[in-house]
Regions:
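Acidic, small-residue rich beta-repeat scaffolds with periodic aromatic anchors
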Residues: 32-119, 148, 235-327
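Short consensus segments that form the blades of beta-propeller domains
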Residues: 135-152, 230-236
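Bacterial N-terminal signal peptides
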Residues: 17-29
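Short N-terminal edge-element motif at the start of the domain
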Residues: 143-213
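N-terminal secretory signal peptides that target proteins for export/translocation
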Residues: 1-12
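Eukaryote-skewed repeat-based solenoidal scaffolds used as protein-protein interaction platforms
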Residues: 198-237, 241
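Acidic/hydrophobic-patterned starts of short beta strands in beta-sheet-rich repeat architectures
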Residues: 117-128, 213-227, 288, 292-300
Length: 327
C-alpha cells in the first residue's frame, strides 16, 4: 500500500535561487505473521542548487537523531561525548582493570561513568583500541566507534559500580566487550543492507539511563548503538536500543531493537542539472505497557511516523524479550 503527497515550499529569494520540492511517501507492508508490524519509508526529495545553505537542507530532517548525524557528517561538528568523566575516588586504571582485565590504559580511546538512579550507582565504561596507532581515528563523535574508512573496530566494556562513602564497589559487568547483535525483522524500520541477519553494532552512541522499569524489581540499563553504510553519493546511519539487567555479577542483554534510520542519497538530475538529495528517515519509540507476562512488563515499539507497532513479551525460556506474535 503506497501513500504519496507532494508540496512545494518557497524560501527567501535573498537566500536561495531555487525552490525545494518535498515529496513524502509512506509504504506499509506486513512482516511475517505480525499483523501490526509494518515497514515504513518516509522520503523527502530536496531539489536544490549549490547556493542552498546547509540550514535549509537540514530543515527537511524531522527527527533530532537525523539533525545530530547531519551536524557531524555534513557540518563537521564534534558533539560532546556522553559521560566523559569519572567521580572522585575512581581512577581510570582502576575502572579499566575491572571492566577489561589485561587491556592497556595506553589503548584507551575514552573512559567515563554516569550516575544511574539515586542509590550511589554508576554505569562505567571504557573504549579500547587494538593498537596505539588506532587512537588517531577517535574523533570524539561517539562514545566508542568503528572508523568507517579504516574498518578499525574498538571494543566497548561497561559495568555498574557503587561508591559507598567514596569507596569503589564493583557490582555487575558485561562479560567482555559489547557484542549483542541487532535484527530488523520486527523493527517497523528500513534495515541495513544485511538487516535480515544479526548485525553486531559498529559504535556506541549514548548511555541511555532512562528508568526502564521492566519489572517491579528490575530497572534496565539502556545503551544506544549505531551502524553506518556508505553508498555512491551518500550514506546511511542507523541506531538501536539495547537493554541490560543485573543478573548476579553480570549485565545481560534482554532487548536489542532498531530505533532510528537516516539516509542521505544523491538523487536524479533534472533538466537544469540540479541534483536532488533524497533523505529517508524513520523512528521508533519504546513504550512500557501496564500488562505483565511472567513477571515482566510488556514492551511496545511504536513507529512515530505511521503509528504501526510491535509488542514484545518476556520469555522465561529465552531469558529476554521476544515479539509477542513473532511467528
Amino acid at each position: 500500500m503506497m501513500f504519496s503527497s507532494t508540496r512545494q515550499v518557497s524560501f527567501n529569494p535573498l537566500l536561495l535561487s531555487t525552490t525545494l520540492v518535498l515529496t513524502t511517501s509512506l509504504s506499509c507492508a506486513l512482516v511475517g505473521s505480525q499483523a501490526n508490524a509494518s515497514q515504513t519509508n518516509a522520503s523527502q526529495t530536496l531539489h536544490t542548487t549549490q547556493t542552498v545553505q546547509p540550514s535549509e537542507a537540514k530543515a527537511a530532517i524531522r527527527h533530532e537523531e537525523g539533525r545530530r548525524i547531519y551536524a557531524e557528517q555534513m557540518e563537521g561538528k564534534l558533539l560532546a561525548k556522553d559521560g566523559q568523566s569519572l567521580p572522585d575516588g575512581v581512577a581510570p586504571k582502576m575502572l579499566l582493570d575491572w571492566l577489561a582485565p589485561g587491556r592497556s590504559p595506553d589503548l584507551l580511546a575514552s573512559i567515563g561513568a554516569k550516575p544511574w538512579g539515586n542509590q550511589g550507582l554508576y554505569l562505567g565504561y571504557a573504549c579500547v583500541v587494538a593498537e596505539g596507532s588506532d587512537l588517531k581515528y577517535t574523533d570524539g563523535s561517539d562514545l566508542c566507534s568503528e572508523n568507517f574508512a579504516e574498518r578499525q573496530t574498538h571494543d566497548f566494556y561497561f559495568g555498574v559500580f557503587k561508591l559507598n562513602q567514596g569507596n569503589f564497589q564493583a557490582l555487575a559487568a558485561h562479560d567482555g566487550p559489547l557484542n549483542t547483535p541487532v535484527n530488523w525483522n520486527y523493527s517497523n524500520l528500513e534495515s541495513t543492507v544485511d538487516g535480515g541477519s544479526d548485525t553486531v553494532p559498529q559504535s556506541v552512541k549514548k548511555l541511555d539511563l532512562a528508568p526502564y522499569k521492566v519489572s517491579d524489581q528490575l530497572t534496565a540499563i539502556g545503551i544506544r548503538v549505531g551502524f553506518s553504510e556508505g553508498f555512491s553519493g551518500g550514506g546511511a546511519f542507523y541506531e538501536a536500543l539495547q537493554l541490560y539487567i543485573i543478573d548476579g555479577d553480570k549485565l545481560v542483554n534482554i532487548f536489542s531493537e532498531p530505533m532510528y534510520f537516516y539516509k542521505d542519497l544523491a538523487g536524479e538530475r533534472d533538466e537544469t542539472g540540479v541534483r536532488a538529495r533524497v533523505i529517508d528517515e524513520g523512528k521508533n519509540l519504546l513504550q512500557l505497557l501496564g500488562r505483565k507476562h511472567q513477571g515482566y512488563y510488556d514492551l511496545r515499539l511504536k513507529n512515530v511516523d505511521n503509528g504501526s507497532k510491535v509488542d514484545f513479551r518476556w520469555s522465561r525460556d529465552a531469558g529476554r524479550y521476544l515479539p509477542k506474535n513473532g511467528g
